[in-house]
Amino acid sequence: MATTMLNQDKMQMFVERYLELSNELKYRKGESGAYLQLGEILTQKGDYDTSTKHFYRAMKIAEETGDGDLKEHAKVNFGMANASMKWTNHVSNIL
């Protein structure tokens, strides 16, 4: 488990750097892909609130750039992360 978290942390660091570079270069498709990857990493970590924000950003940028596949991928992940967040909150309230 500790190794998995360490790998996720490293991956997050690399993707955040990729996002910075994409922003500097104004590479919008790179930005949307980075937001999608960050959302997936944060979902795995259980940070559903932040992951849904990243998926939303990925969706919006993909829409602007005409990347329909990435937009749909981000939309599905947004829905799954949102449902997981609601389920986690529901279970916490019960317990």
Task: Identify the residue ranges that each predicted region occupies.
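Residue at a conserved register position within TPR or TPR-like alpha-solenoid repeats
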Residues: 2-5, 35, 42, 82
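Alpha-helical linker/edge segments of TPR/alpha-solenoid repeat scaffolds
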Residues: 39-44, 78-94
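Extended alpha-helical assembly domains of large eukaryotic scaffold proteins
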Residues: 1-8, 16-21
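Residue register within tetratricopeptide repeats
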Residues: 9-12, 29, 49, 89
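Residue register of alpha-helical TPR repeats
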Residues: 13, 33, 53, 73-75
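Tetratricopeptide repeat
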Residues: 11-18, 51, 57-58
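Short coil/turn linkers that connect adjacent helices within long alpha-helical scaffolds
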Residues: 6, 21-29, 45, 61-69
